[in-house]
Amino acid sequence: FIAEPVQGAGGVIIPPETYWPEIQRICDKYEILLIADEVICGFGRTGNWFGSQTLNIRPDIMTIAKGLSSGYQPIGGSVVTDEVAAVLDSVEFNHGYTYSGHPVAAAVALENLRILEEEGVIDHVRDVAAPYLAEKWHALGDHPLVGDTRIVGMMGSLALTPDKTTRAKFASEPGTVGYICRERCFANNLVMRHVGDRMIISPPLVITPAEIDILIGRARQALDECYARVKEEGLLKAAS
């Protein structure tokens, strides 16, 4: 069974509290390997070193990348339990790589991990940035264009809707309003992507409360501008 602890590129989909415990129970019962894709969630993004810790998952294998070097060098890897490693060691396993164990990428990853530890970056996310961002992010839920706010650690999403009461989808082609909102974000010097009509954000782990205030201010301004344009173009209609 392979999954992200929190689905990132799909729209920051945070599972309900009962989801992962049930997945873990089923995998344990039927001896199914549980593989956690930590490419996005790993290395502090959710407020712990790994998203599996945040969601209380016990994976047999974790895939890692991006945060391993903070994006400064292309590097990825797999982390396995002792049980999985023992199986791999017991048989001959031949596999060819064009590149592997590159010394520059490995050195950058080690230095990145040292900095994360010595500067307390993960502690900062867990104790300072994430709680403050969550409070401010959920406050955007009062905007007439926002039907739902979700956030865990430094991963947040806003669901855009033409009707806050029903949280209905737009009648327009999916992503039409999301694209308009994205463009207004860019115009206000805020990098916020859209997945359909859901806006997603993943700010730097070292962001400060003062910088979060700037982020939220720009997000609200972008939402205001998007709302005005959506009304002007007659797009504020719910799907039937």
Question: How would you describe each model-predicted region?
Answer:
Residues 2-240:
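Conserved N-terminal phosphate-binding loop of PLP-dependent enzymes in the Aspartate aminotransferase
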